[in-house]
């Protein structure tokens, strides 16, 4: 079910942009580029599991009832394994790093979100004196979102992208810094999130031309005059 939901979501936001005239139909080509590799990995895994489950050999029976059950019970004692299992089953760990929609302007240290990854769930302050909020609850899944960390706000909106892009400047704050460190998000950095929450473009200091060029190139549209 999770796979079907992700298939639908991946196609839905792209189709919405095309139907509304904000993107060229070529954007839809990225659906197969992103989702077919996921489907192949899933089928490979489920095929192996199915063979083990239906096999009537004694070895397979021992693996099912003794070995795998004990190994799973032991592994679930560890927080890291539980988190990995959750990400695998929920499929929020799926990434599109090889997608034509993924571009990185900087190389991050191990653990940092990369272009193509689903951006991590954060609870942060979006205003200096504001409350701690759920970042994903603030995101509009009909537009792109530009997240700025450890750098000042834009002096003006990125020209021509008002209807496609929302900018969020995350203020410097001890609680924010702790949350960003927990998710290995470097500062300064910027992340351009697609409507589905995956990272489309990432870098250190904001490059306005790169952001504008990314949207124009991937959506095959021209900035509004």
Can you describe what each PLM-predicted range is?
Residues 17-225:
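Helical substrate-recognition/capping region of FAD-dependent monooxygenase/halogenase enzymes
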């Amino acid at each position: 079910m999770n796979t079907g939901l992700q298939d639908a979501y991946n196609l839905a936001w792209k189709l919405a942009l095309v139907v509304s005239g904000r993107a060229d139909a070529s954007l839809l080509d990225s659906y197969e580029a992103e989702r077919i590799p996921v489907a192949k990995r899933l089928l490979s895994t489920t095929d192996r599991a199915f063979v083990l489950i239906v096999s009537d050999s004694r070895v397979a029976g021992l693996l099912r009832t003794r070995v795998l059950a004990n190994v799973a019970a032991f592994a679930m004692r560890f927080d890291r394994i539980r988190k990995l299992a959750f990400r695998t089953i929920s499929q929020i760990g799926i990434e599109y790093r090889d997608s034509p929609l993924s571009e990185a302007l900087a190389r991050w240290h191990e653990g940092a979100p990369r272009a193509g990854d689903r951006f991590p769930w954060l609870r942060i302050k979006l205003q200096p004196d504001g409350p701690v909020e759920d970042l994903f609850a603030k995101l509009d899944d009909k537009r792109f979102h530009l997240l700025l960390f450890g750098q000042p706000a834009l002096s003006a909106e990125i020209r021509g992208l008002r209807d496609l892009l929302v900018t969020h400047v995350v203020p410097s704050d001890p609680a924010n810094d702790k949350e960003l460190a927990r998710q290995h998000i470097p500062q300064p950095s910027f992340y351009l999130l697609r409507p589905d929450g995956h990272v489309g473009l990432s870098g250190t200091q904001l490059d306005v031309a790169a952001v504008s060029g990314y949207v124009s190139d991937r959506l095959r549209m021209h900035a509004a005059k």
